[in-house]
Amino acid sequence: MNVRLIATILLLSGLPALAQKEVSPGVFEIGKVRINKQKRTIEFPAVVNMKEGLAEYLLVSTKGKVHESVLRTEVEPFQVHVAMLLLGGKGAQTNFFGPDKPSGDPVTIEISWKGFLSTKRVAAEDMVFDRARNRPMSKGSWIYNGSFQFEGLFVAQEAGSIISVIADPEALINNPRERRDDDDNWTINSKAVPSVETLVTVTIKVPRTSPGEGGASSTNSRQ
């Protein structure tokens, strides 16, 4: 997406313009968010926020619902949003999810951290336990729905919601699996999550093709 167009989107959303710094060919940084255009990945730091309990969110900002999230980050939601736009992510930008899977761009999410001898890497879904299936969340993509605007504000930024396990159009990324409307079904898979306050890296990968892209109309009113 054109950088000038992104700047216009930020202005219309009431968000500050962002300076992107090229750290190597095809690799850019926006704050603490690193964008690799060739690999089509976004990376940024976070910490383990909880190791047990209900998992309504996989990741929130420090001003988000930290009492319900596996991870938290100091990175701002709008920085992640701009990084996704730079990789061609569109999202659905709707404030309403129907019974079908959320519309948007499929992405994969990996969490990594330094272990005793080597770097540990797990799929984000490994960190969440599906009570109905009595096993970790099924493997597969998440959906970048892109949140939405309300009265000139970018809602993900206001709510601090980045990756949601339960259905939440305010978040940037949502879980498309069955039972996403059941707040009590998802818990933290403590076997796959390191100790609280462990530093981790969140890596979001955007496929070159998006077969599930689009399908929902854009709106700017909450329901």
Give, region by region, the residue ranges found by the protein language model.
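Long, low-hydrophobicity ectodomains and other hydrophilic envelope-associated domains
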Residues: K21-Q223
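N-terminal secretory signal peptides that target proteins for export/translocation
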Residues: M1-N2
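Sec-dependent N-terminal signal peptides
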Residues: L5-G14
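Sec/Tat signal peptide C-region and signal peptidase I cleavage site
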Residues: L15-A19
